[in-house]
Swiss-Prot record:
Chain ranges on the Mitochondrial matrix side, renumbered to this chain: 25-35
InterPro entries per UniProt: Cyt_c_oxidase_su8 (IPR003205), Cyt_c_oxidase_su8_sf (IPR036548)
GO cellular component: mitochondrial inner membrane; respiratory chain complex IV
Membrane disposition: Single-pass membrane protein
Mitochondrial intermembrane domain ranges by topology: 60-70
Name recorded for this polypeptide: Cytochrome c oxidase subunit 8B, mitochondrial
Species whose genome carries this gene: Eulemur fulvus fulvus (Brown lemur)
Family: Belongs to the cytochrome c oxidase VIII family.
Length: 70
C-alpha cells in the first residue's frame, strides 16, 4: 500500500489541466418564437435529409451489387 500515493500523484496533474468551459445557457424566452409551420418545415427537412439518401441507396442496391462483382 505504500506505493498508492505516488501512483495517485501521477494522475493528478492531467486532471488539473482539463478545464471545462462554462456554458452560456440563457433562461430567457426566444426573441422571435418559432411558429408551428416553421417547426414543421424544419422537422420535415431534417427527416428528408436522412431518409432520401438512404432510400436512394436501398433502391439502387442491386445495381451496386452487380457493378462491384463485374
Amino acid at each position: 500500500m505504500p506505493r498508492l500515493p505516488p501512483a495517485l500523484r501521477l494522475l493528478q496533474p492531467p486532471l488539473r489541466c482539463w478545464v471545462v468551459p462554462k456554458l452560456h445557457v440563457s433562461a430567457k424566452p426566444a426573441r422571435t418564437p418559432t411558429s408551428p409551420a416553421e417547426q414543421a418545415v424544419g422537422l420535415s427537412m431534417m427527416f428528408l435529409s436522412f431518409l432520401v439518401p438512404a432510400g436512394w441507396v436501398l433502391s439502387h442496391l442491386e445495381s451496386y451489387k452487380k457493378s462491384s462483382t463485374a
